[in-house]
Amino acid sequence: MLQVYLVRHGETLWNAARRIQGQSDSALTEKGEQQAYQVGQRVRDLGITHVIASDLGRTRRTAEIIADACGCSVVLDPRLRELNMGVLEQRKLDSLSAEEESWRKALVDGTENGRIPQGESMSEMAQRMRQALDACLSLPENSRPLIVSHGMALGVLVSTILGLPANAERRLRLRNCSISRVDHQQSPWLASGWVVETAGDVSHLEDTALDELQR
């Protein structure tokens, strides 16, 4: 049975400022770097063989810290990027006009073909995220990969594995540097294919998560 660990990147400057990141980028905060270090300490004895990350800076840096603890190198995969938020990227949430907020709401509420202008739909992201996960099936036998990606991207992946619509990710809290795990199994009794073992574990993190403070 293949086990794949899923980690959201550490806290960023734009997370703290409540600014829309999408496929734009901002650096990890000092707290974000510490969160990544705590993930590394949690997983270093789990036999991680591969660290695979979105090629955006915040995931790349998170992955580097974790990979150092595990004695692995980092492989970048652009399919693991966050949702392309189009013309709303880099904007603060409280600066959106009523029309712009309607675009965002249609997208995250699962309106059919909902997307932000110049952006990406949830279903398009779900497709590329599943492709990136399925690529782990081609790794050598006894591999144990760890993927570093983004909040919405990982939420969509976990939701669709469970047979839920992509926009169900809004009901799944994956905090910065949370750890999830999905397994690929073949079973005559249980569901075959990808199954969710855990989602959103933050027991390794020492401080209160930013989104808890901002609720």
Swiss-Prot record:
The UniProt similarity line reads: Belongs to the phosphoglycerate mutase family. GpmB subfamily.
Q: Which GO terms describe its cellular component?
A: cytoplasm
Query: Taxonomically, which superkingdom?
Result: Bacteria
The coding gene here is gpmB
**Which SMART domains does the record cross-reference, listed alphabetically?**
PGAM (SM00855)
Species of the source? Erwinia tasmaniensis (strain DSM 17950 / CFBP 7177 / CIP 109463 / NCPPB 4357 / Et1/99)
User: What protein am I looking at?
Assistant: Probable phosphoglycerate mutase GpmB
> Where is the chain membrane-spanning?
none
Cleavable signal peptide: none
